[in-house]
Amino acid sequence: GNKERTFIAVKPDGVQRCIVGEVIKRFEQKGFKLVAMKFLQAPKDLLEKHYCELSDKPFYPKLIKYMSSGPVVAMVWEGLNVVKTGRVMLGETNPADSKPGTIRGDFCIQVGRNIIHGSDSVESAKKEISLWFKREELVEYQNCAQDWIYE
């Protein structure tokens, strides 16, 4: 239902290029609910756990270096089909394949600098959320706009 959650992170290049507010704005305007957010320099061990499935890829060392090159904004968003819809809002992993109107389609050019991460499934969202956030950092609250967003 509308309690599904996803993990969204603005990567170091997105932070440096000042698109954090734009990302938050788009998720808010869509009607999703912000559940958690933190600004941090991600430790290498956290990034290695986050990207463990890519550890055998040739680009892996560059990916870890890029993701630890500056601070990131880690967020949890909640709402109906938020994982799938969030991925559509982000655009394709490769910005060259992303349509205008998507975050990557509007703000980036190259796959190695694709400014944002979004969970690719409900399962990976659960894993990523528990990796980046403690349970008590996920805020439970009633958002009064929800009645105007869902039937």
From Swiss-Prot:
The active site is at H117 (pros-phosphohistidine intermediate). GO terms for molecular function: ATP binding; metal ion binding; nucleoside diphosphate kinase activity. Its EC number is 2.7.4.6. Gene3D superfamilies: Nucleoside diphosphate kinase-like domain (3.30.70.141). Keywords: ATP-binding, Kinase, Magnesium, Metal-binding, Nucleotide metabolism, Nucleotide-binding, Phosphoprotein, Transferase. ATP binds at K11, F59, R87, T93, R104, N114. Belongs to the NDK family. Major role in the synthesis of nucleoside triphosphates other than ATP. The ATP gamma phosphate is transferred to the NDP beta phosphate via a ping-pong mechanism, using a phosphorylated active-site intermediate. This is Nucleoside diphosphate kinase. The lineage of its organism: Eukaryota, Metazoa, Chordata, Craniata, Vertebrata.
